[in-house]
Design a protein with these regions (language model features):
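Conserved phosphate-binding/catalytic loops and adjacent sensor/switch elements of nucleotide-binding enzymes
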Residues: 52, 56-135, 145-147
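C-terminal helical "lid" of AAA+/P-loop NTPase domains
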Residues: 208-210, 220-225, 231-244, 274-278, ...
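C-terminal boundary/linker of central alpha/beta nucleotide-binding cores
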Residues: 1, 44-52, 58-62, 157-160, ...
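Walker B catalytic acidic pair
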Residues: 141-142
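Extended alpha-helical scaffolding segments used for macromolecular assembly and cargo binding
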Residues: 342-394
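Short, amphipathic alpha-helical segments that act as regulatory/interfacial helices
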Residues: 62, 86, 90, 94, ...
């Protein structure tokens, strides 16, 4: 049942950007690109998994906008249906003192009429066009939380109606939004910032450490260990930069594991979760290898989904679709695999070793599986051929 528009209530924090976090650093390239996108594009999309600093980047850049650039903020929630979203939107726009043709509080009711979404989009666009604002941005934070498809249909219609070049839309999201991005890319009307743009490099990590009173001598190792993941950096820094090179979780990494469990693994369905766990022993993921090791005939489709949803992976080879799991995520998955499916681990390791061209890696997996005879046989059969090349294990 839809809520009566007059009864829709929400916390004011939904339409207020979060306060800037202390210890943030200047990230010139990222901020320059985001500034440029917000100033000129019809749509700006920040897409990356949990904890990559999407909201922090947005709030920092919004705080630096010139006087003539206005913005409104909506933090999306799972229970935001169309009526609730429109109530938030009208409340967020209220401080701009727009010239509405209808009362903005009537938007949720108008949306229920025939062709209501088109009418709502036109009313909002006309109200925005009536303002003397030089440039404005509608910001939807955590857009992936919205489950009502009508909200994205409204956003599509609104994007087509926004008064250009004065207004644009910005989304932060963990998944690809349900919008016609391909068409807008062709028209050069969308700017997309992804994981690669948000990743902290070694210089960023050193600056972050210095800003938080931590010696920068561990910057290189932290950058490598976290792969530039903002949340991982914060969590490891909070416990003194614990690195934990062993297979068991160091105290600092336990915080990372808990975060991953809550924010990532619990959000995917059982099929994808089991696939990730069973493939976590592999340093590189390909459809053929994952299908064999995990005994999952849908491996190719699942890998496409993992890449599409940005689940802490890096694309190594587009032609063969070879992915690499983020180190911390892989550590977490292996830890969970050992805890919840220890009985399956020997079989997974044996299958992984069976077609592994790297002898040292194959022998290591067989040793972990307790398959000592098979490990010795692999050494006897393949080891001598590698000695002249200096490739044998030591």
């Amino acid at each position: 049942m839809l809520e009566e528009p007059g009864l829709i209530t929400f916390a004011q924090t939904k339409i207020q950007p979060p306060r800037l976090r202390s210890g943030l650093i200047v990230r010139a390239a990222l901020e320059r690109n985001l500034h440029g996108a917000l100033a000129s594009r019809r749509l700006t999309v920040l897409q990356a998994p949990a904890g990559w600093g999407k909201t922090s980047a947005l709030t920092r850049v919004l705080s630096q906008l010139p006087t003539g650039h206005a913005y409104v903020w909506i933090a999306a929630d799972e229970d935001d249906d169309l009526q609730r979203f429109l109530a938030c939107l009208s409340a967020a726009l209220e401080p701009l003192d727009l010239a509405w043709r209808i009362a903005p509080r009537a938007l949720p009711t108008l949306a229920l009429a025939e062709r209501g979404l088109r009418q709502v989009a036109d009313e909002v666009a006309n109200a925005l066009a009536s303002s003397e604002i030089e440039r404005g941005t509608l910001v939807i934070d955590d857009a992936h939380r919205v489950k009502d498809p009508r909200v994205f249909e409204l956003l599509r219609l609104l994007l087509e109606s926004l008064p250009a070049p004065h207004w644009g839309l910005a989304l932060s999201t963990r998944t690809v939004p349900d919008l016609p991005l391909a068409r807008w890319r062709a028209l050069d009307e969308v700017a997309e910032l992804r994981l690669e743009d948000l990743r902290f490099d070694e210089q960023d990590v050193a600056a972050l450490l210095a800003a938080n009173g931590v010696a920068p001598d561990i910057a290189s190792e932290l950058a490598r260990r976290t792969d530039g993941w903002a949340a991982g950096l914060r969590l490891l820094m909070s416990v003194g930069g614990g690195m934990g090179h062993g297979r068991s979780a160091a105290p600092g990494q336990r915080h990372v594991f808990e975060y991953l469990a809550d924010e990532v693994l619990s959000a995917v369905d059982a099929e994808l979760r089991d696939f990730l766990l069973r493939c976590s022993i592999l340093p590189e993921l390909t459809p053929r290898r994952c299908a064999y090791v995990a005994q999952q005939p849908r491996a190719g489709l699942l890998l496409e989904r993992i890449e599409r949803e940005g689940l802490f992976v890096v694309l190594l080879d587009a032609e063969e679709r070879t992915l690499r799991l983020h180190d911390l995520f892989r550590d977490f998955l292996e830890d969970r695999l050992q805890r919840d499916h220890a009985d399956e681990l020997p079989g997974l390791l044996r299958r992984a070793a069976e077609h592994e061209p790297d002898l040292a890696r194959a022998v290591g997996w067989l040793a972990r599986a307790g398959a000592w005879e098979e490990a010795a046989q692999a050494m006897a059969e393949r080891g001598p051929a590698l000695v002249p090349l200096g490739g044998g294990p030591t």
